Amino acid sequence: MAYVKAPIPSEVYHLTKKANLESILDDGAIRRFDDTECWFCESLAKMKAYMEQTVLCEGKPYYGAGGQLCRYPKFEPDEHIILKLTPCRREGNWYRWNQEIPLNSPPELVQTAAEFSKLKIGFRGDLPFRNAEAIDVAEFLHGSIVCRNVQTTSEL
């Protein structure tokens, strides 16, 4: 079973392009777009580890939401932000996707897949939130956390 229910987190972190910030704040929600879930990390340490294994690996292959083989493009930290969000309570919609691996895989691969699976958590549907903060990605990748409060349209 690839999906397992997860407890409701008190806060989550979401990597997105800066160009998306205005519409996210207008909506007061993270939209799932072409996937069944929208994805988050439960801590900045998990976010950094997740980024190091995904978006920071230019050219690394991955499977997109539709099962299409893709490759990570060059990551531009100045074009992205990390949003720290307080989810509005949505019982039962949080899931963890356990990385699928072939039967009889070497123990090292099993361990790597299990560790990767713990880095992210999915929310089924669009996630409404409150108390948003925007974290500068370039500074974050250099070890500094520079954040600012941002307000949704309904909070203004």
Q: Could you say what each language-model-derived stretch is?
A:
Residues 32, 47, 107-108:
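Segments that shape or occlude catalytic/ligand-binding pockets
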Residues 44-61:
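Short active-site loop/helix that positions an aromatic residue
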Residues 1-39, 52-55:
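ADP-ribose/NAD+-binding catalytic cleft of ART/PARP-like enzymes
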Residues 36-42, 110-115:
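A generic structural motif
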